[in-house]
């Protein structure tokens, strides 16, 4: 028998808390296709934690270093 990797899956409420956004934003982001990847099982929406981590990393902004004379 082969081993399967376990992936943590979150519902919409837990996802909103995980990424610091509202559930309403997640719904809007899904309709506009600008949010994190999601899994649809029947009428349930779920998010994989590795996908959320990647989504957050791609939106990281690193400010430029200010040099003073």
PLM region spans:
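Polyanion-binding surface elements
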Residues: 1-28, 40, 58
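A broad helix-preferring feature
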Residues: 12-16, 45-46, 51
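Short Lys/Arg-enriched helix C-cap and helix-to-coil transition segments
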Residues: 38-45
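A short, Lys/Arg-enriched interface patch at domain edges and termini
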Residues: 50-69
């Amino acid at each position: 028998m082969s081993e399967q990797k376990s992936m943590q899956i979150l519902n919409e409420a837990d996802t909103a808390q995980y990424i610091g956004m509202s559930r309403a934003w997640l719904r809007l982001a899904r309709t506009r296709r600008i949010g994190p990847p999601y899994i649809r099982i029947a009428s349930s929406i779920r998010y994989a934690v590795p996908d959320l981590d990647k989504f957050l990393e791609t939106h990281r902004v690193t400010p430029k270093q200010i040099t003073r004379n």
